[in-house]
């Protein structure tokens, strides 16, 4: 076989040997050798291939597949702007530590700077946002290159998984390909072989880091369980403010209850991304703050952390009076939220979040959009223990949420997937609904859109203060007036407009593929609703 075909065949084979099971491919000419090899592997049942025409959407599809499947997922594209469109997904994968592999085809490097069409300096395009930038040299008619190709693939996967660094994340794998870009009509020459028995060319053991931190639990302690945290059994029994995507280590502590407490000690696990009340506690110089994290990132936004480590060595027991007070304040906060929801005259995103959280069953997978939905979910209730919760909290952008939900649903075989997002988030990534004929489709994905015709989160921020009412609606509210039913019809995705009261009943019915449930909400009273909740505390 010709050199480019041989190289692509070896790369795809080694990806499969290294544990890759899902690959997203965008059509192009320069990446044709990879496309042929991927299609062959898909037909052989060695991996599942997903075709997408938009690289930005494809990147977030791969992100969702990687998060839910807990495996590296390559996204393969041609050269030029196709690679640049992966920027947002790479940023999210970097800060969320998701093993995304950007596998870009390139022109032969001698074409750079010559004015050759669709040729850009794409090597190094992602800079510090990737764990590694790895390039293969041009393939030659030389069988000894097989070991170099396969070794490079193993290096890519190790960097993406963080097996040597403890820091998983995106990797840019760039492959220059010379013509011919299609397989020979009459195959000749040896097929590049891998290790016997389907083994990876190079195996890498996970690096381990054990840094104990001594903690005395007799002090009044709260735990802040942030995104990316692992379960910490040593913290069981402690009041815990857990983000929806994070494990509940101990006794649930409502985030609004923090304003009524004066803890002496706070323990961070993972990376907190929500709640101003949490930020205030962690920045309070009278609170001793400790951080339990893995990976190289510094886990201290406020500069107030006393010590960091990977696990706690605990002594002492919590004061029962402190535990009882935290439990009582949590119950009071939960009651206040639900009471004010019942009293509020109009449906809001908070009402939709409450209906969704209440309707979830064991085995469900929930994907929460950024902006208000993830915050609303945190305020109304903590997810049931057997519900799997995902969200793009790396850089907490709204982009790519529909595509990530599709990817997460495709990778999850344990039950149904429900995605909750706002209307701007849905519109921003509506092209994520475009799935080609014959492509793998989720079997049970419901996208719930809380449609308040604009940016509801700004109603709750400083910009939403009545003194700025004259400019607020156009530049922050951003009403769009879009017909979501017509938009869904264009993508041939079933759509239904439902009320908050009917949402639970509708969610109980199977999606039978992908469906969109639109709930009309009002954002004009959001500021008043949240103020009324706080007034009850």
From Swiss-Prot:
Instruction: Write down what this protein is called.
Output: 2-succinyl-5-enolpyruvyl-6-hydroxy-3-cyclohexene-1-carboxylate synthase
Organism of this sequence: Rhodococcus erythropolis (strain PR4 / NBRC 100887)
**Family statement:** Belongs to the TPP enzyme family. MenD subfamily.
Please describe what this protein does. Answer: Catalyzes the thiamine diphosphate-dependent decarboxylation of 2-oxoglutarate and the subsequent addition of the resulting succinic semialdehyde-thiamine pyrophosphate anion to isochorismate to yield 2-succinyl-5-enolpyruvyl-6-hydroxy-3-cyclohexene-1-carboxylate (SEPHCHC).
| Pathway annotation | Quinol/quinone metabolism; 1,4-dihydroxy-2-naphthoate biosynthesis; 1,4-dihydroxy-2-naphthoate from chorismate: step 2/7; Quinol/quinone metabolism; menaquinone biosynthesis
User: Which Pfam families does the protein's record reference?
Assistant: TPP_enzyme_C, TPP_enzyme_N
**Cofactor, how bound (note):** Binds 1 thiamine pyrophosphate per subunit.
InterPro entries documented for this protein: MenaQ_synth_MenD, THDP-binding, Thiamin_PyroP_enz_TPP-bd_dom, TPP_enzyme_TPP-bd
